[in-house]
Amino acid sequence: MNPIVKQILWIRVFLIGLGLQAMLELFRKDERAYKIMGTWVRNLGILIFMMPIILAPFDAQSRIEGILGASFRIIGIISSALGIIFIIVASKHLLKVAGSEQIPRELITDGIYGKVRNPIYTGVILLTIGWSLIWGAIYSFFIITGIVVLILLGLIKFLEEPMLKKFLGDKFLEYRKRVPMLFPLPVMVVIIALVITMIVFVATGLIPLI
């Protein structure tokens, strides 16, 4: 199978993970069922969603090698570490405020949520970028990261933010104006610069494609 097509087909696994997360809404209608199955379904959905991020870089594909690969590997380690930190810190803060159901009763604007509105998603994106770079997986860097970003933006724009706007109104709108969605501007500039650099290296043949 073409390695690019194989990377794209990982989207099927992402969708299964999202489907399990959607099932949580069914369990929420039955408090007893949610207590028994809710946590298991949520964790299974997260595990399945993370599978392409972790496994796709091991598929046959073009690799960044040599000194260039070592340099990007360092960037990947830093990005992955930051991603894990974001996920852990944001999850602990959410658990503290919202409880085991992870449904906040009011808008969370303190701590890491005062820096970015969706810090768990920020962490997932940083981890996806970093893990691909650690293994020098050029197709995963572009394709898997692209899929993850599109899915998370879709969840934010079409599901989560409309719900927050409906229930919290002006309070959420003010928070949205004040706090960036995923990345502060300097970090966004660094990520864009990284992507452009990768594109230039591919275009000039410094990173060969198979």
Features from the language model and the residues they span:
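Short, amphipathic, aromatic/basic-enriched membrane-interface segments that mark the entry/exit
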Residues: 108-119
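Membrane-anchoring alpha-helices and their flanking helix-loop junctions
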Residues: 1-109, 123-210
